[in-house]
Amino acid sequence: MKTKIVLAALSVIILLGACKKIDELLTFTVNDQTEIVIESSAPFSLPVEIPTPDITTNSDEEFSNNGTRSDLVKEVYLSNLVLSIKSPEDKTFSFLKSIHIYIRTNDSDEVELAYKDNVNSDAKFINLDLTHERLDKYIKADSYKLRTEVTTRETLTQDVTIVVDMSFKVTADPL
């Protein structure tokens, strides 16, 4: 009787371990990066849109490198979005009151990607709060566009260049 219980428990442990391993094989991260520039002419304490260039995805290659294809992708979520100040070197995020970043493609509606309100940071980088929107159609597209809206808490004396690092968690079926 004890042998049967031990075998049953061992089988459950092996099965759970195998499921976790399969899930790991089907989940991977796609990283994208872009830069935005907040110009010194930006008005103080009013929301301002910051232009961003289109971001070309390398999704077909990324999917292929991870043993899948675009049509096998089940879901994509933003797992991390970090902003870091590139220049000026001595600048921190103390000038920033709030930031909201939106994503869209030519064929898809715009959705909010991440945000941070009441920014209170003397650091050179900040993690934004994520909206947990499903982003499959944006990452599968050839390119997507970000729209950034910022509100500053002080007047800027020089342009501030910010690097936007994004990590997307992709879950897909294998080939």
Which positions does each model-derived feature cover?
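Post-signal-peptide N-terminal segment of Sec-exported extracytoplasmic proteins
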Residues: 39-74
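A short beta-strand element within beta-rich, extracytoplasmic domains
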Residues: 75-90
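Short coil-to-beta strand junction motifs in C2/discoidin
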Residues: 76, 92-99
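Cysteine-clustered segments with highest specificity for TGF-beta superfamily mature ligands
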Residues: 123-165
